[in-house]
Design a protein with these regions (language model features):
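N-terminal signal peptide c-region/cleavage motif recognized by signal peptidases
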Residues: 13-15
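Compact alpha-helical subdomains of small soluble proteins
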Residues: 51-110
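Bacterial N-terminal signal peptides
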Residues: 2-10
């Protein structure tokens, strides 16, 4: 997890909040959320987990974003898309294998 990663989110629909930069803990939370969401969808698509497990993982993603990332939902979603587009699929799955437990400890949801 690169806690120093900086993410800029541009929202052309709302020029007042046109750019949002996340860094430090918030950037790390975004990366964790992306990792969990992508892994959930991928595993479910390969029939390695069921829909219920996928929904739990996606729910954890939402809670991480709600509790550990500031800004509007639109800003968070835009930043999450940037993280997704900057990370390769294999790198994201490797992140999951190495860092999932640490993410959940670093960004508790309960």
């Amino acid at each position: 997890m690169a806690a120093a990663a900086v993410l800029a989110a541009s929202l052309s629909a709302h020029p007042v909040s046109a750019a949002r930069t996340y860094e430090g803990e918030e950037a790390a939370a975004l990366r964790c959320a992306n990792m969990l969401a992508l892994t959930a969808v991928t595993l479910a698509g390969a029939d390695l987990i069921g829909d219920q497990e996928k929904e739990v993982m996606l729910g954890v993603t939402v809670l991480i974003l709600e509790r550990h990332v500031s800004g509007t939902w639109r800003q968070k979603k835009a930043a999450l898309e940037i993280v997704r587009d900057r990370r390769s699929f294999p790198d994201t799955l490797d992140d999951y294998r190495r860092n999932a437990a640490r993410c959940l400890a670093q960004f508790p949801i309960n």
